[in-house]
């Protein structure tokens, strides 16, 4: 029992130093950063106490209990204690100055504090997540770090980063010597694993389909407590590797917090696990910590947006090569129309590195950097170029089919699909006759020949691609979610909605003038 308790305590103490300190363990005389969270918020030298317990247990196992074992154990602990008091603490006081003296005044040496501030507690799950990131993710993806000197020495501050894949929080969070509270979308909390990991770090969800005042207050409260908060200003992961627009509401929230901003740029994260891919790929990632944006440079919202964009987005996306035997797996959900004939839902995966259009028969070879070529030409194009090409005339071909409802004057339907389920927070409708239609004026939910619900584009505040092949709209603070069939492509619906909404806003503006 003594050995197990001692081992657990010593390992936990070392992990805290490796994560939040400078990585120099107990007998170092050149400490540059001390740890004041977890066990170190309760006593200045937890490793000493756990070491004493451990070595006493070892002596008991090999010699059994007697008085000389007890005195030997106390003697070893006394030597270690004298080293801590006369050498290490003295050097730390001289090296770290007033900050360490304040720490000494607040944290005892001879006993443990049982009550500490909430922001000084470090959970087991938080340590587990960090350890997974360091031992597995950093090693597997060979993460390279740049600009670590830009990480602030003092809290609080806000981290903003481009968002390219599920692993983004690991790819930079493991290098920041503070516990980070991540602001995530509420959808991430739908899986048991992500809920376990995220709640363990104190992260919290923010709803995108309405103003989430509770989450906003939570974020502001954490900042006021001196914690580090990370928010992804795009509001979601990139689909094709190109950056998403920065949300104005997020910018205003960041500006309201009035703390320094640490921008982070991730290069290569999209390639190792694209949003459309069910499988991860082996590749290299570079994490770049950019210069801090001070509070005094945040007064103008447009200038703040420009600074954040400049730091977290690349001027030109260059796709890094990855290792994968099935690089095309899931790619039909990205390339939702043929580059040549523009037929929708026609791209099929034929092998791990090839695609084919079922309509015109064109075959495409996909390289390890996601570039595409045909047998008839050596010129390659990126998936981003492919998407831009099929978006160019996307509104020129409205649907020519019978719909289960009557179109309004000047209304043109562009997309229609049967759906598996429709739900809000209070309502669930699930049958085989549901259909979803997107026109240049509205989104319509129908059942056989009956129009069930209709939402004007003017009233829709947000359209999102969700998990498990679903899309959602936000209307009046209510989220309406539509589960699509497996063959339907969410990116296609997002693209059409964005373009139709843009046309609708432009026409509405012209009519007002």
Task: Go through each PLM region and give its residues.
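Hydrophobic transmembrane alpha-helices
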Residues: 5-7, 37-41, 46-115
């Amino acid at each position: 029992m003594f050995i197990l308790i001692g081992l657990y305590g010593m390992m936990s103490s070392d992990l805290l130093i490796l994560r939040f300190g400078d990585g120099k363990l107990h007998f170092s005389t050149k400490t540059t950063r001390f740890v004041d969270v977890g066990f170190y918020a309760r006593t200045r030298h937890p490793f000493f106490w756990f070491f004493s317990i451990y070595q006493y247990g070892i002596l008991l196992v090999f010699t059994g209990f007697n008085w000389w074992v007890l005195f030997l154990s106390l003697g070893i602990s006394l030597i270690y204690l004298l080293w801590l008091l006369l050498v290490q603490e003295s050097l730390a006081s001289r090296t770290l100055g007033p900050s360490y003296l304040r720490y000494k005044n607040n944290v005892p040496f001879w006993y443990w504090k049982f009550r500490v501030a909430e922001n000084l507690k470090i959970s087991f799950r938080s340590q587990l997540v960090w350890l997974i990131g360091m031992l597995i993710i950093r090693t597997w993806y060979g993460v390279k770090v740049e600009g670590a000197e830009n990480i602030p020495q003092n809290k609080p501050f806000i981290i903003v980063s481009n968002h390219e894949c599920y692993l983004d929080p690991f790819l930079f969070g493991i290098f920041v010597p503070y516990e980070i509270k991540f602001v995530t979308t509420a959808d991430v909390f739908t899986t048991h694993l992500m809920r376990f990991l995220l709640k363990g770090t104190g992260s919290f969800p923010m709803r995108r389909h309405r103003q989430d005042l509770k989450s906003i207050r939570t974020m502001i409260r954490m900042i006021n407590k001196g914690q580090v908060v990370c928010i992804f200003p795009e509001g979601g992961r990139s689909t094709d590797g190109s950056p998403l627009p920065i949300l104005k509401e997020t910018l205003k929230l960041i500006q309201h917090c009035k703390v320094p901003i640490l921008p982070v740029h991730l290069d290569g994260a999209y390639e190792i696990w694209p949003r459309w891919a069910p499988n991860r790929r082996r590749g290299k990632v570079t994490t770049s910590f950019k210069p801090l944006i001070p509070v005094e440079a945040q007064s103008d919202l447009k200038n703040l947006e420009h600074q954040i964009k400049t730091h977290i987005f690349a001027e030109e996306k260059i796709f890094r090569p990855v290792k994968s035997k099935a690089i095309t797996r899931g790619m039909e959900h990205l390339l939702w129309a043929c580059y040549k004939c523009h037929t929708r839902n026609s791209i099929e995966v034929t092998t791990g590195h090839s695609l084919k259009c079922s309509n015109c028969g064109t075959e495409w070879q996909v390289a390890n950097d996601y570039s595409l070529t045909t047998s008839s030409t050596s010129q390659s194009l990126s998936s981003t170029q492919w998407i831009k090409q099929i978006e160019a005339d996307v509104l020129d071909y409205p649907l020519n089919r019978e719909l289960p409802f009557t179109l309004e004057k000047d209304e043109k339907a562009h997309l229609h699909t049967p759906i598996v389920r429709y739900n809000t927070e209070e309502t669930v409708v699930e049958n085989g006759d549901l259909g979803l239609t997107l026109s240049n004026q509205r989104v319509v939910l129908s059942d056989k020949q009956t129009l069930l619900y209709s939402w004007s584009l003017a009233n829709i505040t947000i359209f999102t691609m969700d998990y498990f092949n679903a899309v959602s709209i936000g209307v009046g603070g209510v989220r309406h979610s539509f589960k699509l069939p497996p063959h339907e492509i969410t990116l296609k619906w997002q693209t059409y909605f964005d373009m139709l909404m843009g046309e609708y806003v432009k026409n509405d503006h012209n009519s007002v003038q």
